[in-house]
């Protein structure tokens, strides 16, 4: 299983994105069927894609979800509480809502690998102190 941040979703769905090829190539290193994202990351990606290219790239992203190639993790109350705690802790970085959701999901799902174009994941540790394995 690989957690998927906003950046790769945008890059995969938008061929003009600067990270498109590196994200496409990164997919070859792990199973696409093992991608998991969060609602905040999916919403952020849909917003960015809508502004950048409208419905066509959004439709590509919907395809990943509807075809079962990417699952959307739904948080429990404990994760929401953890997200608030994380955003407070990293307010000087700052940590946004989508990143907080991914860190909290990683702790719940006990997963360290994150597919991201965001360098903040080199700063954020999991609650257990483990560092993320960042792809690409």
Residue ranges of predicted features:
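Active-site neighborhoods of divalent-metal-dependent phosphate/nucleic-acid chemistry enzymes
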Residues: 72-114, 119
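Acidic, PIN/NYN-like endoribonuclease modules and their adjacent C-terminal/linker elements
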Residues: 1, 109-136
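Short glycine/serine- and small hydrophobic-enriched flexible loop segments
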Residues: 47-50, 107
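Amphipathic alpha-helical segments within well-ordered protein domains
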Residues: 10, 43-46, 84
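Short, well-structured N-terminal submotif of metal-dependent ribonuclease cores
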Residues: 1-37, 50-61, 128-129
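Alpha-helix/helix-capping structural signal
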Residues: 7-8, 40, 78, 119-120
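Conserved beta-strand segments of alpha/beta enzyme cores
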Residues: 34, 71, 131-133
């Amino acid at each position: 299983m690989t957690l998927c941040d906003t950046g790769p979703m945008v890059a995969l769905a938008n061929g003009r994105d600067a990270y498109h090829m590196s994200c496409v190539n990164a997919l070859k290193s792990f199973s696409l069927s093992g991608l998991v994202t969060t609602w905040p990351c999916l919403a952020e990606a849909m917003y960015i894609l809508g502004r950048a290219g409208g419905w066509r790239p959004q439709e590509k992203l919907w395809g990943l979800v509807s075809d079962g190639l990417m699952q959307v993790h739904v948080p429990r109350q404990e994760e929401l509480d953890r997200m608030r705690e994380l955003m407070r802790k990293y307010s000087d970085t700052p940590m946004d809502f989508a990143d907080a959701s991914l860190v909290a999901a990683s702790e719940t799902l006990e997963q360290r690998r994150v597919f991201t174009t965001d360098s903040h994941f080199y700063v954020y540790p999991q609650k257990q102190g483990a560092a993320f394995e960042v792809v690409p």
